[in-house]
Amino acid sequence: QSTNDLIKACGRELVRLWVEICGSVSWGRTALRMTLSEKCCQVGCIRKDIARLC
């Protein structure tokens, strides 16, 4: 799967993706993650966006 694929994921699906990309979910930078979560849900994001927050 390409790192540029646009992913529209919300809730559990987003968490599942996060674990797949990062290996685990630690919610340290909460504000930034919430912003990204909303973006991923509404307009989509790419795997690189999520990987940056690992």
Curated annotation (Swiss-Prot):
Pfam families: Ins_beta. GO terms for cellular component: extracellular region. The modification Pyrrolidone carboxylic acid is found at Q1. Keywords: Cleavage on pair of basic residues, Disulfide bond, Hormone, Pyrrolidone carboxylic acid, Secreted. Gene3D superfamilies: Insulin-like. InterPro entries: Insulin-like, Insulin-like_sf, Insulin_CS, Nem_insulin-like_b-type, Repro_Hormone_Insulin-like. GO terms for molecular function: hormone activity. Coiled coil: none annotated. Its main location: secreted. SMART domains: IlGF (SM00078). It is found in: Secreted. Disulfide bonds join C10-C41, C22-C54, C40-C45. The keyword Secreted applies. Heterodimer of a B chain and an A chain linked by two disulfide bonds. Relaxin is an ovarian hormone that acts with estrogen to produce dilatation of the birth canal in many mammals. Belongs to the insulin family. This is Relaxin. It comes from Balaenoptera edeni (Pigmy Bryde's whale). The lineage of its organism: Eukaryota, Metazoa, Chordata, Craniata, Vertebrata.
